[in-house]
C-alpha cells in the first residue's frame, strides 16, 4: 500500500475507533487527525467531511462489478440483488464485524440521517451505471437500484442494532425479498 493508502486507512481506523469509543457526535475531526498522527488539513484531503470518514463505502465498486457481470437478460431487480449477494458473500469475518460496528455507530447518530441518504445516492448511481452497462434503460435502472439500496439499508441497520442474526442471514432475507425470490 502506498503512502496515500496507508494514511487513508489510518484516518479511517482512527475515526471508527473514536466514534465507537465516544460516539459520532462527540468526536471532532481534530481528534481523528491527532489519533492518526496527521494534521486536520490532511484528514480533509482524504475525507471532505467527518461523515465521509464513517460513510465512505468501499463496497460500491465490487457491487457494481458484480451487477455488470450478471446475465444481460436478467431482470434489473434480480441483477442488483444477486450482484450484491455475490459481492457481499466474499466478505471476511473481520469485514463483517467491522461493518456491524460501523453500522451501529451510524444507527445511533441522529445527525447522520442526511449523510446516509447522500451516501446511498452514490451507491445507487454506481449500481444504476452497472445496470445501464448491462443494457437496462435509465428509468428502470434507477428505480431498481434505488429500491434495492433502500431495502438493503433498512435490513443492514436492523441487523446492526441486534445480535439475533448473522449478516449472511439478514442479507439473504432482504435480497430474496428484493430480488423476487
Briefly describe each language-model feature range.
Residues 129-132, 164-181:
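C-terminal peripheral helix-coil segments that are non-catalytic and often amphipathic
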Residues 1-22, 26-41, 55, 62:
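Basic, helix-initiating cap at the start of DNA-binding domains
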Residues 1-4, 103, 175-176:
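N-terminal intrinsically disordered/low-complexity leader segments
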Residues 145-164, 180-181:
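Amphipathic C-terminal alpha-helical segment
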Residues 64-101:
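Hydrophobic alpha-helical connector segments
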Residues 19, 28-29, 50-56, 77-80, ...:
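Amphipathic alpha-helical segments enriched in hydrophobic/aromatic and basic residues
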Residues 109-134, 142-146:
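Amphipathic alpha-helical packing segments from all-alpha helical-bundle domains
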Amino acid at each position: 500500500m502506498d503512502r496515500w493508502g496507508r494514511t487513508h486507512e489510518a484516518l479511517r481506523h482512527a475515526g471508527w475507533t473514536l466514534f465507537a469509543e465516544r460516539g459520532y457526535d462527540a468526536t471532532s475531526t481534530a481528534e481523528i487527525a491527532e489519533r492518526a498522527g496527521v494534521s486536520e488539513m490532511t484528514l480533509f484531503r482524504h475525507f471532505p467531511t467527518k461523515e465521509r470518514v464513517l460513510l465512505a463505502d468501499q463496497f460500491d465498486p465490487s457491487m457494481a462489478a458484480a451487477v455488470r457481470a450478471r446475465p444481460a437478460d436478467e431482470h434489473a431487480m434480480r441483477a442488483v440483488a444477486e450482484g450484491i449477494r455475490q459481492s457481499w458473500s466474499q466478505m471476511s469475518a473481520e469485514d463483517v464485524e467491522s461493518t456491524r460496528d460501523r453500522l451501529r455507530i451510524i444507527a445511533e447518530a441522529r445527525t447522520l440521517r442526511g449523510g446516509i441518504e447522500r451516501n446511498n445516492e452514490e451507491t445507487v448511481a454506481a449500481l444504476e451505471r452497472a445496470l445501464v452497462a448491462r443494457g437496462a434503460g435509465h428509468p428502470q435502472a434507477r428505480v431498481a437500484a434505488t429500491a434495492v439500496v433502500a431495502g438493503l439499508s433498512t435490513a443492514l441497520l436492523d441487523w446492526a442494532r441486534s445480535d439475533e442474526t448473522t449478516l449472511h442471514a439478514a442479507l439473504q432475507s432482504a435480497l430474496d425479498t428484493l430480488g423476487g425470490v
